Every structure is written in structure tokens, then in C-alpha cells.
Regions:
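N-terminal secretory/targeting leader peptides
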Residues: 23-119, 138-364
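Bacterial N-terminal signal peptides that target proteins for export
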Residues: 1-8
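Divalent-metal coordination cores built from histidine and acidic residues
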Residues: 119-120, 133
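Hinge/lid segment of periplasmic solute-binding proteins
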Residues: 126-141
Length: 364
């Protein structure tokens, strides 16, 4: 249990904890679940620079690599206990503590409601999502303040050693899938889903332990090195068509920050969401072209995948709503939003998609 580790860590963290207030300056040390080179960490550093600028240097954030203070699996508990000032991960990492975390971090199949990454942000900003997100931490009984920073999706279905033409082909393969509800949904449709840490994926592919894998989208996937092992890349997937990363600040440390500077941090977080969304479109486009030059074949996901995954996702979502009142409340809020917004948004995006595909065809 995490609490049993606290005493062992406390002595080692005395020097670390000296990041407390000094002359009105709050310095926050924030551990990521990633190493220091990932593009996500770069965006976190950009956020930290904005915070420092908007607070005139009264609040500064230092980003530490994954595992540098506590194991990544203990990160949210360490922030809660005050062993570390803050953490950075994806909200759905904590679905084991509360299933509703998935509806904020990676609502499978667009929460079963046709919500894409941009529509999810509309719900978050304009239809009560932010207030429910703030409530999530109380529901999890955690002394943290969450800051949604990075909408990343849509994520790709993944990388395969050979083409798949149907779900029957997919079911023959061992597939690295996200942990938690997305991975379970794959199992529900008969896919041999395997959960493993990022550092284990490429070795597992090289050794034949797994046959296919997902991680994110073109830029992170290219940087990860999937193209060195696999050549068939399927962009359209439903397990994380919406995916978001966030920062968690210990509640006591947060209360040491003035109300004015807290507001500045929220403004910086809003800017970070825009930066992440807009930068990803361009960066993923550049990375996709690079992958194609390296011999990667871009494939279309079989139609029966969408039918089967959507049905299983809806069953999983309903089961969680039946079992957890707060999950049901969040999902109902998303449904109310979707009933009003998705018919318009999906219709508008349909014409945009056709326009984009027509232009893309001229480039071949």
C-alpha cells in the first residue's frame, strides 16, 4: 500500500520539500510520467513559462522526469500526501481510483455519444465539464487541484505487422492496448489485449510477444520508433478518439498561492489547451509525411471494427453508470451536451472532412 511507503520516503524528501514558499515565491516541483524528451513534456514546460510570466515570477514550476521521485504508479497518491508538489499524466491513468476519470481522460468511443476532441473541449468549457472535473478529485478523496492542459487526440488505432481486413483478422493478433476500460473493451470484442508500459512495447514487438500496438498519434508514434518495427499504420480508432493529459497540484501547496496567481494559472492552462490542440494538428501532419517517406503504409480501419467496438463501449459505459452515481452524473452531462451539439458539429465536420480528403487526393 502507498501509505506504508510514506515513512520510507519522507527522510529522502526533506531536501526536496524545501521547494516551499521563500519570500512569497512558490516553487512547484512536478513529476511527469514521461521522460524529459517527450513532446508532451515540452508543452508542460511551455505552460510553466506562461505561469512564471503571468505571475511575475511568483509561481515557478520545475518539471521532473518520470520515476525521479516516486514510481509513476504512485504519482497521484504522492501528490495527495504532499510528498511531491505536483504530477503530470493522463486523467484516465487514475480510472482504478474512480471510473469517471476515464470520461475526462479518454472517454471511449467519444463517450458513446459521437463526441470528438474539439466537441469534448466545448463540453468542458461551456457545458459544465470543468465544474465536474473539479469535483472529480473530491470524489476520489484526493487533496489535489487538477489543471487540464493537453487535449491530444484523436489517437490512432495502432501499428500492425500485417494488414487487417476485418475483426476476424484483428482477433488473431496480440495487441498492446491502453489499460483499464479501453483495454477491457477490446477484450469484450475478442481481441487479445495486453497492457504494458511504454518502455516495454518495442522490445515486446521485436521478440514477437505482441503482434500490434497502439500509443498515440503520428508525432509521438514516430518519436517512439514504431516505424522501425512495424509498417502498417491504422489512423482511425475509437479507444481514445478523445484523450487528455493534465497536471495535479497538492491542495495545500495550491492554497499557498494567492487568488490572483491561481487565476493566472487557470488562464495559462486554458492557453495550454489551445496550444496543444493547434500544435498537434501541424506536428502530426509533418510526422505523418515523414512516416510515409520511411515506408510506412497508411491503412483504413475495417468497417466492422466500428460496429463491434461501439456496441461494447456503450455496454461498458452503461455498466459503469449503473454502478457509480458520479460516473452517471458526468455521462449524463456529456449526453445532454451531445444531444444539443453533436448533430450540428458532426454535420459541419462531414463537409470539412470531404473537402480535406479531396485536397489530400490531389497530393498523391
Amino acid at each position: 500500500m502507498f501509505k506504508n511507503k510514506v515513512g520510507l520516503l519522507t527522510a529522502a524528501l526533506v531536501a526536496f520539500s524545501s521547494s516551499a514558499i521563500a519570500d512569497g515565491h512558490v516553487h512547484l516541483k512536478v513529476q511527469s510520467v514521461l521522460n524529459s524528451t517527450g513532446s508532451e513534456v515540452g508543452y508542460v514546460r511551455d505552460f510553466a513559462e506562461d505561469v512564471a510570466a503571468l505571475t511575475d515570477g511568483r509561481v515557478t514550476i520545475e518539471v521532473l522526469p518520470g520515476g525521479s521521485v516516486v514510481p509513476n504508479s504512485d504519482l497521484i497518491d504522492a501528490v495527495d500526501a504532499g510528498l511531491i508538489d505536483g504530477g503530470f499524466a493522463w486523467t484516465h491513468y487514475w480510472s482504478g481510483k474512480h471510473p469517471a476519470a476515464m470520461l475526462f481522460g479518454s472517454p471511449i468511443a467519444g463517450a458513446g455519444l459521437g463526441i470528438d476532441n474539439i466537441a469534448w473541449l466545448s463540453w468542458f468549457h461551456s457545458a459544465g465539464g470543468k465544474e465536474l472535473y473539479d469535483q472529480l478529485w473530491d470524489e476520489m478523496d484526493l487533496n489535489v487541484v487538477g489543471l487540464m492542459l493537453q487535449p491530444v487526440g484523436p489517437e490512432a488505432l495502432g501499428w500492425f505487422k500485417e494488414p487487417i481486413n476485418s475483426m476476424d483478422d484483428f482477433r488473431k493478433l496480440r495487441f498492446r492496448a491502453p489499460p483499464g476500460i479501453p483495454g477491457q473493451t477490446y477484450k469484450d470484442i475478442g481481441v487479445a489485449a495486453v497492457a504494458m508500459g511504454g518502455g516495454d512495447i518495442l522490445p515486446a514487438l521485436e521478440k514477437g510477444v505482441i503482434d500490434a500496438a497502439e500509443w498515440c498519434c503520428p508525432e509521438p508514434d514516430r518519436d517512439f520508433g514504431f516505424q522501425k518495427v512495424l509498417k502498417y499504420y491504422y489512423l482511425q480508432g475509437l479507444h481514445q478518439n478523445v484523450v487528455n493529459a493534465d497536471m495535479y497540484i497538492n491542495g495545500d501547496r495550491w492554497n499557498e498561492i494567492s487568488a490572483r496567481d491561481q487565476h493566472a494559472i487557470h488562464v495559462a492552462a486554458r492557453a495550454a489547451r489551445l496550444d496543444s490542440m493547434s500544435n498537434r494538428i501541424y506536428a502530426n501532419g509533418i510526422a505523418m509525411a515523414d512516416l510515409l517517406e520511411q515506408g510506412v503504409q497508411l491503412m483504413d480501419t475495417p468497417d466492422d471494427y466500428f460496429v463491434e467496438f461501439m456496441a461494447a463501449a456503450n455496454a461498458t459505459l452503461q455498466k459503469n453508470a449503473d454502478e457509480n452515481a458520479f460516473f452517471a452524473e458526468v455521462w449524463a452531462s456529456q449526453r445532454d451536451f451531445a444531444e444539443k451539439a453533436v448533430p450540428f458539429w458532426s454535420g459541419a465536420q462531414s463537409s470539412n472532412a470531404k473537402l480535406g480528403l479531396a485536397f489530400a487526393a490531389t497530393l498523391k
